[in-house]
Design a protein with these regions (language model features):
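Catalytic and substrate-binding regions of extracellular carbohydrate-active enzymes
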Residues: 319-323, 331-584
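Catalytic-domain carbohydrate-binding cleft regions of carbohydrate-active enzymes
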Residues: 1-384, 416, 420, 457, ...
Length: 584
């Protein structure tokens, strides 16, 4: 029986990498025209895979909106294969909700055109999350295809297997053992073609569980290969024992489903034996990583719960604005972008997207809070302070917040007129125009006071508690008091002379020494991988004298540690073990 080689035309589209999104868009417009022309004018050219992401279509249609119907027709014919993702997401750095939304909005985009590819197609993501089968099954997707992170050390030497999550969810996997580009620019020259195929075909055969293998015909930003039929004819001449034909990824899964004798694997895929998984990217460009984590948290833990509370009270749930925010950050969730293995100019663009997203998030959070507070009953007509608890359980915790008022002194009461015990930890004068331009627009130029206060109270689950602020003659403002250690129900913390901490855990009855010992060392790697300098003398803060202060009030403790460390100023100084600059 002849072995079947499925040649799958596709392109892998990095929206940005060492080039910007706008640079790639120029290529995209040309590539899309060639792809559609080929499909429309050659009905024996059956399929083309659009890299599993709809952001490509979004970028193209921003330039050529008049071509939407052309795309729609080809998608509905089953020839231009789109989705299911919005972008080619990373799985290890971004949050789980971001992965879900990437699929949700990608599928939503696909619905405007027709069917989407029901494969969790992530051919270049740097490792695979153990929860991916569970996520994919939630969208009725039962197939997965990827390249990076798998070897026989995971429990199988085959490139096809069932992948199971802890909850029992399962997907059928087709690994791309040599990546997504082994069929790029297939040559017409017989010697060149044989040289390449003689190297690749045995590897594909070895991992296969059926007589069907995949030869992906595409690469990064690669235009469609117009002479593919001539190349297929040449392949048939070179390898008469095989069948070569244009296909799509779903076709090989149909063949795999016929094979019941297939391994089952659990867990994540981060093995770099046969392909790089770039685990060092987890700590590159921490400004970008921290911005992403912060904004993801604001959306999922503040904005959307707050919007749900507002909706339950009769206000609009702004689906469109929230989708816009998610899509802004999901453009940054592509594996290269959030991996921060791009050029500096691209990293600037990534940070700008996060800036735009966070502006929308913060403003929408403020909008919802104001709508909820403004709608409160007239008996709450005094100045109000409202504490929200957006968790699904009651919380009795310390709240740190601000009161902005013209009052020189005030007291705080709940709706039952119980006086709230609070403490002012900081106050400052602020110009009225910095609060809201509408205040000074009406001639009110008097400054306001911003009081930072702490208090402890019980706030109901997925709800809020309102307080009234009443002006009084005077109030007690308790400042922090200086102390020599932190001591509470859980820990005793002391600051050592060099700025490290000695922590005694009362629950464990265990002492931890030299906490916050800092290590400074060099990295001679590239944008992907950390590479330590050979024979470098690492620098620690164990021999310095730090300036530290410990303060406390009734509600919290504060430790501040400052010191200066002498370190090399650049990689050459590090190679010479020469510390010639300072960091604070």
């Amino acid at each position: 029986m002849k072995k079947n080689v499925h040649i799958v035309p596709h392109m892998h589209w990095d929206r940005e990498w060492y080039f910007s999104t706008e640079e790639s868009r120029i290529l995209l417009v040309n590539n899309m025209e060639e792809i559609m022309d080929m499909l429309e004018n050659n009905h024996n050219y059956p399929y083309y895979v659009m890299d599993g992401q709809t952001a490509i279509l979004e970028d193209y249609l921003a330039v050529k909106p008049e071509c939407k119907e052309r795309i729609k027709k080809l998608v509905q014919e089953g020839r231009l294969i789109i989705g299911p993702w919005y972008t080619q997401t990373d799985e290890m750095v971004v949050g789980g909700e971001s992965i879900l939304r990437n699929l949700l909005y990608g599928i939503k985009d696909c619905d405007e055109f027709g069917e989407y590819m029901k494969i969790g197609y992530l051919p270049d993501s740097f490792g695979q999350s153990a929860q991916m089968p569970q996520i994919l099954n939630g969208f009725d997707i039962k197939y997965s295809m990827f390249w990076r992170g798998c070897s026989e050390r995971k429990g199988t030497n085959k490139t096809e297997f069932n992948w199971k999550s802890d909850d029992g969810s399962s997907v059928l996997v087709q690994i791309l053992p040599l990546g997504y580009a082994i069929g790029k620019y297939l040559p017409m020259n017989e010697d060149e073609l044989r040289t390449r195929m003689d190297k690749y075909l045995p590897v594909l055969d070895k991992g296969a569980t059926t007589d069907h293998i995949i030869l992906p015909n595409g690469h990064d930003q690669m235009p469609i290969q117009k002479n593919i039929f001539e190349v297929i004819y040449k392949l048939k001449e070179c390898y008469p024992e095989r069948k070569f034909f244009l296909s799509r990824y779903e076709n090989i899964f149909k063949e795999l489903e016929k094979n019941e004798d297939i391994d089952t694997i659990k867990g994540e895929f981060l093995d770099g034996k046969y392909m790089r998984v770039h685990r060092s990217i987890f700590s590159t460009r921490m400004d970008i990583k921290s911005a992403n984590a912060r904004i993801e948290s604001k959306i999922t833990n503040i904005l959307e719960p707050l919007a749900s509370i507002a909706y339950s009270l009769g206000f609009e749930y702004h689906y469109g604005l929230i989708e816009l925010i998610w899509k802004e950050i999901m453009k940054n969730h592509a594996h290269d972008s959030i991996g921060c293995c791009c050029s500096d100019k691209v990293h600037h663009e990534i940070m700008n997207r996060f800036f735009l997203a966070e502006e929308k998030v913060d403003q929408l959070i403020t909008f919802y809070k104001r709508r909820i507070v403004d709608a409160m009953s007239c008996e709450m007509a005094l100045d109000k302070l409202v504490a929200f608890n957006l968790m699904p359980y009651d919380r009795n915790e310390i709240v740190s917040t601000q009161v902005i008022t013209k009052m020189k002194a005030f007291e705080i009461f709940d709706k039952d007129n119980n006086k709230l015990d609070f403490e002012v930890v900081h106050k400052e004068v602020i110009d009225a125009g910095l609060i809201d331009r509408q205040i000074v627009h009406y001639g009110n130029y008097d400054s306001f006071m911003v009081y930072t206060i702490n208090f402890k109270d019980k706030i109901p689950a997925m709800g809020y508690k309102a307080y009234m602020i009443k002006e009084v003659e005077h109030m007690l403002e308790k400042a922090y008091e200086v102390c020599d250690m932190v001591d509470n129900d859980f820990y005793t913390i002391q600051v050592n002379e060099n700025g490290t901490l000695k922590i005694f855990d009362k629950k464990l009855n265990k002492t931890f020494e030299n906490v916050l010992l800092m290590e400074n060392g060099g990295d001679e790697g590239d944008e992907y991988d950390f590479s330590p300098l050979p024979n470098e003398k690492l620098i620690f803060n164990d021999n310095i004298v730090a300036n530290s202060t410990i303060k406390k009030n009734r509600f919290n403790n504060e430790i501040k540690i400052n010191y200066r460390l002498k370190v090399p100023k650049d990689i050459q100084a590090r190679k010479n073990n020469r510390a010639d600059s300072f960091i604070d």
